[in-house]
Amino acid sequence: MIFKDYDFLQNYDLKNFGEKVKIYKELLSKFNRIHNLTHLKNIDENIFDSIKILDFYDFSKAKNIADIGSGAGFPAVFLAFLLQSNFHLFEPNPKKTAFLRTLKIECELSNLHIYKEKVQEYKNTFKADIITSRALMDIKPLLEICTNLKDENTVFILWKGSEIYQELENIKDYEIFENNLRKYCIVK
């Protein structure tokens, strides 16, 4: 994938990003052979899906970003490749956590912090400016399990599909941006 062709990425270090993406793909391939971390067929599409939010939302003021149910790193890892924010990834699966920790070392990501626990079990030491999650669970239960990480200024950015509108019942302050079948939902 040629990232320099996208206008919304023009202000980022795409050479460094490309190098880290290459490391990511090699490491994922190696881990997937043993641990079956993900069934994704088109990694490039999923990487693009992870960073497309930068076209819709300004992350520049976010100091701490929490990602819930990080799995194989979509979307948080690719945002961490581009942004200076501290990323806190919550993933209880030991195999996925091992992958993320290895990736952190291989890519020299000092802004990546990985927690092998469910977010609701975390004894917080920070409040997140942004909380991200990609298709983990419905919105309302997600908001509830993140109580210990959020305050009145926390913004949720959620990668969702076509069922999003049913999930937004009783949620008042939100925006939705669309790219193909993906719905990026920002809940304030």
Swiss-Prot record:
Annotated family: Belongs to the methyltransferase superfamily. RNA methyltransferase RsmG family.
Gene: rsmG
Lineage: Bacteria, Pseudomonadati, Campylobacterota, Epsilonproteobacteria, Campylobacterales
Location(s) in or outside the cell: Cytoplasm
Function of the molecule: Specifically methylates the N7 position of guanine in position 527 of 16S rRNA.
Chief localisation class: cytoplasm
A GO term from the CC aspect: cytosol
EC numbers for this chain: 2.1.1.170
Record-given protein name: Ribosomal RNA small subunit methyltransferase G
Positions that bind S-adenosyl-L-methionine: G69, F74, V119, Q120, R134
UniProt-recorded Gene Ontology molecular function terms: rRNA (guanine-N7-)-methyltransferase activity
